[in-house]
A protein has these predicted regions:
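Ribonuclease/tRNase effector modules and their secretory precursors
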Residues: 1-107
């Protein structure tokens, strides 16, 4: 069953967010805060689904950070907790101008 942004928004709070080790490194490298991730979920749309991710299904969300800058966040969930898998500012060398569509040559 695909994840729904409305369900993610309902559980999106500091008490329900876990940050993976990989995500912690990426957030620090990119200057991204957990507040930016919350903003992304609250303002964003799911643009890719990863239903077979382990240990929980995940999805890629395109939303805005707290400074209203587009951001991508991969969020896994068991519908009780949100796990931040990674987050980054989308790069136009890998994404079309809509920031929702991967470029063909991206692997």
């Amino acid at each position: 069953m695909p994840l729904k942004i409305e369900a993610l928004r309902e559980i999106c709070s500091l008490e329900n967010i876990e940050v993976t080790t990989h995500a912690a490194k990426r957030l620090e490298q990119g200057g991204i805060s957990v507040g930016d991730i919350i903003s992304c979920v609250k303002t964003g749309k799911i643009i890719e689904q990863y239903p077979t991710d382990y240990p929980f299904p995940s999805c890629l969300i395109l939303g805005m950070n707290v400074k209203n800058v587009p951001i991508h966040a991969v969020i896994g969930t068991n519908l009780e907790t949100l796990w931040i898998v990674t987050a980054y500012f989308p790069n136009l060398s890998k994404w079309e101008s809509d920031l929702k569509t991967r470029k063909e040559n991206d692997s």
